[in-house]
Design a protein with these regions (language model features):
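Short arginine-rich
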Residues: 76-78, 84
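Short S/T/G/P-rich N-terminal loop/turn motif that feeds into the first structured element of a domain
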Residues: 1-50, 59-67, 83-125
């Protein structure tokens, strides 16, 4: 699984433009083979900073998205004035687990917090 972390600082008065561009891309994104999910957030520390976090099955799926013409067009719009700055990080997900699905948790973590332990039962109530 691949994670894409896109931090963006819209130019003054351009925050809504970014959100509109993201909304235009969403239907195309959801049709992409290998797309898993995307969410957007605003920083609590820097109110000008937005973050888009997306997950992809593999690098090939991400490469296909990167080369969709509409996506390239929106990227160019962003670079021409919607963004004051941005930073993109692409990372391989090493493990993917949660409170109840512990299959990929490290063995020491599974031993310390087994599914069905008293602390988890209380949390579910």
């Amino acid at each position: 699984m691949i994670a894409v972390i896109f931090e963006a600082w819209p130019a003054p008065g351009k925050g809504e433009d970014y959100m509109e561009m993201a909304a235009q891309l969403r239907p195309h994104l959801e049709k992409m083979d290998g797309f898993i999910s995307v969410e957007r957030f605003r920083s609590l520390i820097d109110s000008d900073k937005l973050l888009s976090l997306s997950f992809w099955r593999d690098e090939a799926a991400l490469e296909a998205w990167r080369n969709v013409e509409m996506h390239r067009s929106v990227q160019a719009q962003g670079r021409r004035g919607v963004f004051r700055d941005y930073r993109l990080r692409v990372a391989a997900v090493l493990r993917d687990y949660g409170m109840f699905n512990r299959d990929e948790a490290p063995s020491d973590s599974r031993a310390a917090h087994p599914v069905g332990s008293d602390d988890l039962l209380g949390a579910r109530l």
